[in-house]
């Protein structure tokens, strides 16, 4: 329920209302539907401001049943002024970015690299390819993971175990993918 105080002003009948509602109009009315306001503050600066502001409320006779006059206040139902609809927004939670171990399987080498996969956006390379047996790819990958403080110890162990498994598979096959 909205509670407001209004001040009578004969000149305001010709002015347009700031509240546009199908039930409120500028038609002449038989029963006055306004009252004198009471100041909220008694400071001198507020009393100067209230002299400049004149408020008026216009109500058509067919809507007087929706308006209740009580003392110096006019109460108007909320649905008279604004019809609000509640909108619901469904937000799908984003998947967390993942760390992915990529590899290139070649006859004489195997390359290992680390990427970050961001769901809905693609991948971000976090390292170049480290090749084994030319260099120790596993050791280079371990140093890279240790230099990234945002990668947890658990993730680091999982990625290094995956790298070990891939290197072992490559060694067992002798670089030949068909065997």
Swiss-Prot record:
Task: Indicate whether rRNA-binding appears among the record's keywords.
Answer: yes
Instruction: Classify the main location.
Output: plastid
For this protein, the record's Pfam families field holds:
PSRP-3_Ycf65 (PF04839)
Q: Where in the cell is it found?
A: Plastid, Chloroplast
GO CC term, one of those recorded: ribonucleoprotein complex
Keyword Transferase in the entry? The reply is no
Q: What UniProt keywords apply to this chain's record, in alphabetical order?
A: Chloroplast, Plastid, Ribonucleoprotein, Ribosomal protein, RNA-binding, rRNA-binding, Transit peptide
This protein's superkingdom?
Eukaryota
Residue ranges that the Swiss-Prot or TrEMBL entry lists as coiled coil: none
Q: Single GO molecular-function term?
A: structural constituent of ribosome
From the record, give the cysteines joined by S-S bonds. none
Q: Where is the transit peptide?
A: 1-58
Q: Which GO terms of type biological process are on file?
A: translation
**Protein family according to the UniProt entry:** Belongs to the chloroplast-specific ribosomal protein cS23 family.
**Assembly and oligomerization:** Component of the chloroplast small ribosomal subunit (SSU). Mature 70S chloroplast ribosomes of higher plants consist of a small (30S) and a large (50S) subunit. The 30S small subunit contains 1 molecule of ribosomal RNA (16S rRNA) and 24 different proteins. The 50S large subunit contains 3 rRNA molecules (23S, 5S and 4.5S rRNA) and 33 different proteins.
Q: Describe its function.
A: Component of the chloroplast ribosome (chloro-ribosome), a dedicated translation machinery responsible for the synthesis of chloroplast genome-encoded proteins, including proteins of the transcription and translation machinery and components of the photosynthetic apparatus.
The name of this protein is Small ribosomal subunit protein cS23
Q: Which organism is it from?
A: Spinacia oleracea
Q: Gene that codes for this?
A: PSRP3
């Amino acid at each position: 329920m909205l509670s407001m105080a209004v001040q009578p002003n004969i000149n305001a009948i010709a002015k347009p209302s700031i509240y546009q509602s199908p039930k409120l109009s500028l038609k002449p009315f038989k029963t006055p539907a306004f009252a004198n306001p009471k100041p909220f503050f008694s400071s001198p600066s507020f009393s100067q401001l209230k002299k400049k502001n004149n408020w008026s409320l216009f109500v058509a006779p067919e809507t007087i049943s929706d308006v209740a006059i009580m003392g110096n206040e006019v109460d108007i139902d909320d649905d008279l002024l604004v019809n609000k609809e509640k909108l619901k927004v469904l937000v799908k939670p984003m998947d967390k970015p993942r760390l992915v171990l990529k590899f290139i399987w070649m006859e004489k080498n195997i390359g290992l690299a680390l990427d970050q996969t961001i769901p809905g956006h693609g991948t971000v390379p976090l390292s170049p390819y480290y090749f084994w047996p030319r260099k120790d790819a596993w050791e280079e990958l371990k140093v890279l993971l240790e230099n990234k403080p945002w990668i947890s110890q658990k993730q680091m162990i999982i990625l290094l175990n995956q790298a070990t498994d891939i290197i072992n598979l490559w060694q067992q096959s002798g670089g030949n993918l068909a065997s």
